[in-house]
């Protein structure tokens, strides 16, 4: 249904959230047992700077009721499509609930379409090779509506994804990292389901870090800086990745997803030659290779890692999946046999202990308005969203470009809203980041995003982020 009102600019424009491939909880629509609440934008018809009341009356009382009737009245919906959408969501949730029971961290159904149309499109690639699970990793899932489906189950532990260039390693990992969300019918990844708290990690040169215990990975810095409470305005790749893992542990993630291509090499592994040239006493970094096993056995955190250059990870992997011309092959048995032929020089890592970060979130005092009716009063915090890349809160830029599981600008907008609320209501110089996020999580579960809205109403244009992304946002706020 389209309508164009008389007037200048966006007169008569009626718009609502533009949904993508992922299913997100959005402020655009809320359904309870008693009511449906829809939120949308209307461009008031105007002549210059004056609202055209006659045209506005037509929008509100003639055209808008037609839109509402077509969109929300059950008699006007495609009953079959509506039913299938509900059934699909229930089946997807069923798979996710079965992962832990089956000791899995992810599931990829047979016949899934993993490649995307392009780097700027999340639609499925036409004529791509459908996913088919290797027999040794094939599991079944009993779903309430679809019945029994089969696919590849990725077990808890350390999983290595290997293969030649362009054979589909990163494509599989990308599908798994977005498997924390349900997907719409026709996406191709409807039954690619990952543990809901799984976290994609990468290096972030130049990121801000405050009071993070990175001693699990980095110690004995030449400048004598205490790595149990480490801060920097300009982190290196290895330091940023170490901080990201520690922050992920704090956020409750039990599955880490990493790609060698976007990781700091010196953080991930040190080969035998380098160990001979630079002794352990001269190297402050304990590589991830030496910590991954402890993370699983002592903290219950699984790892899914894409690797293509270093064979050292074969020695710690529980499961090894080779992508061969877009087909997964379980080569775990072959790898175990070869590990004896190519032994790994053992380096004794420092004793494992869980990080103990105690980070207090701080805030700057707002500036004072210098002119206008509010002269002499504190400036209001304003949010300016920069797509999925981040937002400006007041004068502080929050850079979220490396948070790869943010899939929608509306999630970024919601993160800005939540951070603003926290700074104005919860940050007191005493509470830790973890305590603040826990309080926010309770409010989110109780009232939804409306708990953080300015005034009494929540507008359209917000989508609920995961707790992991809330932590990531707060950890990147320089304050």
Map each language-model feature to its residues.
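N-terminal accessory targeting/assembly segments
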Residues: 1-103, 114
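Flexible beta-alpha connector loops of hexameric P-loop NTPases
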Residues: 52, 207, 215-238, 270-285
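Carboxylate/His-rich catalytic cores and anion/metal-binding grooves
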Residues: 102-104, 110, 166, 173-204, ...
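N-terminal pre-Walker A segment at the start of P-loop NTPase domains
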Residues: 115-150, 185, 193-198, 202-209, ...
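Glycine-rich phosphate-binding P-loop
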Residues: 149-181
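Phosphate-binding/switch loop-helix module in NTP-utilizing enzymes
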Residues: 228-263
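Conserved NTP phosphate-binding and transfer environment spanning the P-loop NTPase/kinase superfamily
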Residues: 297-300, 306-479
């Amino acid at each position: 249904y389209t309508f164009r009102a008389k007037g200048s600019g966006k007169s008569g424009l009626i718009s609502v959230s533009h949904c993508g491939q992922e299913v997100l909880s959005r402020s655009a629509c809320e359904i309870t047992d008693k009511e449906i609440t829809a939120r949308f934008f209307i461009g008031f018809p105007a002549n210059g700077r004056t609202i055209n009341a006659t045209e506005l009356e037509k929008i509100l009382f003639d055209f808008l009721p037609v839109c509402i009737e077509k969109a929300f009245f059950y008699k006007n919906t495609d009953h079959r499509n509506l039913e299938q959408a509900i059934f699909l969501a229930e089946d997807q949730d069923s798979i996710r609930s079965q992962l832990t029971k089956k000791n899995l961290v992810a599931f990829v159904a047979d016949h899934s379409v993993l490649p995307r149309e392009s780097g700027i499109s999340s639609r499925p690639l036409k004529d791509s090779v459908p996913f088919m699970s290797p027999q040794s990793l094939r599991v079944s899932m009993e779903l309430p509506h679809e019945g029994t489906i089969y696919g590849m189950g990725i077990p808890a532990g350390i999983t290595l994804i290997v293969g030649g260039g362009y054979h589909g390693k990163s494509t599989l990992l990308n599908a798994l990292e977005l498997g924390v969300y349900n997907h719409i019918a026709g996406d191709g990844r409807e039954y690619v389901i990952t543990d809901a708290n799984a976290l994609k990690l990468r290096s972030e040169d130049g990121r801000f870090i405050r009071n993070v215990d990175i001693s699990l990975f980095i110690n004995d810095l030449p400048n004598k800086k205490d790595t149990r409470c480490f801060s920097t305005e300009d982190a290196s790749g290895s330091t940023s990745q170490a901080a990201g893992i520690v922050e992920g542990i704090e956020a409750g993630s039990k599955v880490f997803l990493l790609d060698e291509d976007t990781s700091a090499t010196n953080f991930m592994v040190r080969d035998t030659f380098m160990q001979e040239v630079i002794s352990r006493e001269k190297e402050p970094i304990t590589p991830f290779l030496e910590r991954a096993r402890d993370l699983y056995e002592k903290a219950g955190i699984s790892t899914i890692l894409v690797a293509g250059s270093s064979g050292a990870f074969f020695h710690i992997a529980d499961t090894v999946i080779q992508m061969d011309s877009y087909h997964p092959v379980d080569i775990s048995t072959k790898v175990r046999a070869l590990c004896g032929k190519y032994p790994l020089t053992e380096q004794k890592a420092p004793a494992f202990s869980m990080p103990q970060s105690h980070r207090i979130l701080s805030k700057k005092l707002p500036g004072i308005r210098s002119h206008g009716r509010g002269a002499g009063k504190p400036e209001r915090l304003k949010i300016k969203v920069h797509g999925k890349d981040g937002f400006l809160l007041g004068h502080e830029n929050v850079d979220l470009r490396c948070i790869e599981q943010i899939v929608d600008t509306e999630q970024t907008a919601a993160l800005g809203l939540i951070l603003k609320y926290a700074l104005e209501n919860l940050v007191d110089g005493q509470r830790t980041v973890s305590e603040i996020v826990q309080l926010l999580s309770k409010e989110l579960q109780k009232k939804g995003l409306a708990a953080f809205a300015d005034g009494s109403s929540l507008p359209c244009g917000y989508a609920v982020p995961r707790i992991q992304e809330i932590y990531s946002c707060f950890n990147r706020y320089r304050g």
